[in-house]
Amino acid sequence: MPLREFKIVVLGSGGVGKSALTVQFVQGIFVEKYDPTIEDSYRKQVEVDGQQCMLEILDTAGTEQFTAMRDLYMKNGQGFVLVYSIIAMSTFNDLPDLREQILRVKDCDDVPMVLVGNKCDLAEQRVISTEQGDELARKFGGCAFLEASAKNKINVEQIFYDLIRQINRKNPGPTNKKEKKSGGCILL
């Protein structure tokens, strides 16, 4: 079976741990130091449900920065990881507008996405409950929701694997090479 490519975009406010989640998933290391991202792209080959997948993961700047570039990320992305920090309410409140922007740019109501409450290892500093995350996911049309910790490797792989499964359900890949090459035009 051929390798299928997936374009995933990680979005959220500055400091929520987008890079930490991405680097933990791709390289298996936790980045302790906060170094604001402009844009980083990572590739990782994984197997999900028996399918070989090449993920191209775009780790973006915080939503408050580089807004002009964001429409382009959204246009090209097939699936989105929307990240907030469970210890910062403002990062949670930013997500509905971000989701609306994705739906507007994609011109679609059904876009594969996972809502992620990051930094669940800091439970004693929590200001956003798991129930609030669940409720927001329901408001987002029942999108997937996970709490994660890049530091402790909690739910990191599940975020990306769930997104791959959503993309596959929405847009199954070709079942054979002939089908992939088929196409054509109709002359009228």
UniProtKB/Swiss-Prot annotation:
SUPFAM superfamilies assigned: P-loop containing nucleoside triphosphate hydrolases
Catalytic activity: GTP + H2O = GDP + phosphate + H(+)
Propeptide: 186-188
CDD domains noted in UniProt: Rap1
Main location: membrane
Alphabetically ordered keywords of this record: Cell membrane, GTP-binding, Hydrolase, Lipoprotein, Membrane, Methylation, Nucleotide-binding, Prenylation
E.C. no: 3.6.5.2
Pfam families: Ras
GO cellular component term, pick one: plasma membrane
Enzyme class label: hydrolase
Record keyword Hydrolase present: yes
Compartment(s) of residence: Cell membrane
The protein, known as: Ras-related protein Rap-1
Recorded topology in the membrane: Lipid-anchor
Residues holding GTP: 12-19, 59-63, 118-121
Sequence motif Effector region, residues: 34-42
GO biological process per UniProt: Rap protein signal transduction
